[in-house]
């Protein structure tokens, strides 16, 4: 069974995936390998619509394996991805209040996030997406006051993962 981590930017999807297993798949990293540039560069050159098409193709390929997948925050923007998430078991929604997520995003200087350049726009995006995340989740974890290790333990308990 695949475990798929979803949630808004800054929720800790990649961090948690790394702690769950060494052999996790970071969807954003796979996409960057496929497009041979950063996601930020791709957004600037081709826009979000073209990015979402590639994201869907890479996601569908990743779903064919029994792996841990850390998705990008916008995975739910494509209806095809929403359908795929809805039919998959093991979808974990990592959530927190917007201010907590914004603080994390703002402190993360290693990741350029094209859709997080403006706080108000990011908050609107957060509000737009949060219900879709919740609809497809088999497990929702509020990460606000939890360490990555505590989150991993909850996931392991839910599915009996060692």
Swiss-Prot record:
EC nos: 2.7.1.71
Keyword Metal-binding: yes
GO cellular component: cytosol
Pathway membership, UniProt: Metabolic intermediate biosynthesis; chorismate biosynthesis; chorismate from D-erythrose 4-phosphate and phosphoenolpyruvate: step 5/7
Protein name: Shikimate kinase
Function statement: Catalyzes the specific phosphorylation of the 3-hydroxyl group of shikimic acid using ATP as a cosubstrate.
Positions with a binding annotation for ATP: 10-15, 113
Cofactor, how bound (note): Binds 1 Mg(2+) ion per subunit.
Catalysed reactions listed for this entry: shikimate + ATP = 3-phosphoshikimate + ADP + H(+)
Listed HAMAP family: Shikimate_kinase
Keywords of this entry: Amino-acid biosynthesis, Aromatic amino acid biosynthesis, ATP-binding, Cytoplasm, Kinase, Magnesium, Metal-binding, Nucleotide-binding, Transferase
Species classification: Bacteria, Bacillati, Bacillota, Bacilli, Lactobacillales
């Amino acid at each position: 069974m695949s475990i798929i981590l979803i949630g808004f930017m800054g929720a800790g999807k990649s961090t948690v995936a790394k702690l769950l297993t060494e052999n996790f798949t970071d969807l954003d990293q796979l996409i960057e390998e496929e497009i041979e540039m950063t996601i930020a560069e791709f957004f600037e050159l081709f826009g979000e619509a073209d990015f979402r098409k590639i994201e869907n193709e890479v996601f569908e390929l990743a779903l064919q394996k029994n792996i841990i997948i850390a998705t990008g925050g916008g995975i739910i923007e494509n209806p095809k991805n929403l359908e795929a998430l809805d039919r998959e078991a093991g979808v974990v929604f990592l959530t927190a209040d917007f201010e907590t997520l914004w603080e994390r995003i703002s402190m993360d200087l290693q990741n350029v996030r094209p859709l997080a350049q403006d706080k108000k726009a990011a908050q609107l995006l957060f509000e737009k997406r949060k219900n879709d995340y919740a609809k497809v989740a088999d497990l929702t974890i509020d990460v606000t006051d939890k360490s990555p290790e505590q989150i991993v333990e909850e996931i392991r308990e839910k599915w009996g993962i060692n």
